[in-house]
Design a protein with these regions (language model features):
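Hydrophobic structural segments
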Residues: 1-197
Length: 197
């Protein structure tokens, strides 16, 4: 028995997608959340590989890094290039020097049930910059903006949910191939979901 929310019954988008899946004999296995449940979190394993940041990771602090000193603008340009991001939103001074970085991929920067979590992480780990997937603009955005305008060396780079997590999913086939030897496994990039005008 499959679960179908009431609001989808008869929905044109749902019916067309269901037909596409059925006609092409596609099986879908949504595994993303399981990637986060492993230790270490496989999304961050992939992110660290892609950015070559393993050596910058703070032991025992899986979302925190100490990188070579750079500016917010330079860090943003690096992340945009490596993660294939078209647009980065910045709060704080773009010329601010940063070394201590927090990186909360996808919805992690929403706080995972505790909307103050990103701000507490920034404060408790004395982070210069928080790199985020998606944010609650009325909390984290305001906190970082206030800190920067009050003269503290604080900034935030927002890259989007999809682009910060897809890079970790890219490494799923490596892991999965070991579990199903002989079965072809590959990664298909979803790409940037937005168009920018």
């Amino acid at each position: 028995m499959k679960y179908l929310p009431e609001w989808l019954a008869g929905d044109e988008v749902y019916l067309l997608k269901q037909k596409l899946i059925h006609d092409n004999r596609i099986n879908i296995w949504r595994f993303h959340d399981h990637m986060h449940m492993t230790r270490p979190d496989r999304i961050y394993v992939g992110l660290n590989k892609e950015l070559s940041w393993d050596q910058y990771s703070i032991p025992g602090k899986p979302h925190c890094y100490v990188i070579p000193a750079t500016t917010v603008e330079e860090l943003s340009a690096f992340l945009k290039k490596e993660l294939d991001v078209k647009v980065a939103q910045i709060i704080g001074k773009t010329d601010a020097r940063v070394e201590r970085v927090g990186f909360l991929v996808g919805g992690g920067s929403l706080g995972l049930g505790s909307e103050q979590m990103p701000m507490e992480l920034m404060r408790n780990e004395n982070l210069d910059v928080m790199v985020c997937g998606e944010i609650l603009e009325w909390t984290l955005c305001a906190y970082v903006r206030d800190a920067s305008q009050l003269g503290l060396n604080k900034a935030m780079i927002v890259l989007g949910h999809n682009r910060t997590e897809e890079v970790g999913m890219k490494y799923l086939p490596e892991w999965l191939a070991e579990l199903v030897p002989g079965m072809p496994v590959w990664f298909v990039e979803a790409g940037e979901p937005f168009s920018y005008l």
